[in-house]
């Protein structure tokens, strides 16, 4: 669709997690949150704009780790580690710009938010589900806490690029610029 620029409002920057929550006036189909525990070896699908360009990434769950985000906070943060499996389109280099993008399971539910990468090791780190729920709860907006899922998506290792394209076209996944 046409490119639009909208200012975010009701911005909430988490002091505890490398996450932020905000609203825009535009509307897009909402994704739901997975309630089942993550399982080692499960598939995940990351959608966003690495290097400023649309892309979809397939990864496989390795486990939990703690990182120091090194930004505003000096604490360690629990995150989920994923082994990168495939990029579409195929490109090399950084995933910078993917941060903040949703990570979905095979049922199209949110299981994380991309936070940082370890390029040398082929790892992607995402926020832990508890961190997402904590950030949403602290935002005070009931729409974040119990979203009304309106988007139903089935994703697999072959179809995920077209699913990502559809999510970007519907603006369920959008490029966000922070300054």
Model-derived segments and spans:
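Short, flexible beta-strand-to-coil junctions
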Residues: 47-51, 106, 117-119, 177-179
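Conserved beta-strand residues within beta-sheet cores
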Residues: 7, 43, 58, 100, ...
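N-terminal activation segment of mature serine protease catalytic domains
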Residues: 1, 150-179
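Long, contiguous hydrophobic alpha-helical segments, chiefly transmembrane helices and signal peptides
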Residues: 44-47, 103, 114, 173
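Solvent-exposed, polar/charged alpha-helical surfaces in well-ordered, non-transmembrane soluble domains
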Residues: 31, 39-45, 130, 134, ...
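Active-site region of chymotrypsin-like
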Residues: 20, 25-30, 55-144
């Amino acid at each position: 669709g046409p490119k639009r620029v909208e200012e975010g409002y009701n911005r909430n920057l988490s002091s505890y997690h490398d996450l932020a929550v905000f609203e825009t006036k535009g509307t897009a189909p909402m994704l739901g949150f997975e309630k089942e525990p993550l399982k080692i070896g499960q598939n995940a699908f990351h959608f966003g704009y690495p290097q400023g360009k649309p892309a979809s990434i397939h990864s496989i769950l390795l486990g939990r780790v703690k990182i120091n985000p090194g930004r505003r906070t000096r604490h360690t943060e629990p995150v989920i580690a994923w082994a990168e499996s495939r990029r579409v389109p195929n490109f090399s280099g950084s995933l910078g710009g993917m941060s903040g993008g949703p990570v979905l399971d095979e049922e199209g539910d949110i299981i994380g938010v991309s936070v940082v990468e370890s390029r040398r090791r082929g790892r992607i780190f995402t926020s832990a589900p508890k961190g997402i729920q904590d950030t949403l709860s602290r935002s005070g907006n009931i729409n974040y806490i119990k979203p009304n899922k309106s988007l139903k998506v089935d994703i697999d290792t072959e179809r995920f690029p077209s699913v990502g394209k559809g999510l970007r076209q519907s603006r369920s996944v959008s490029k966000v610029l922070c300054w």
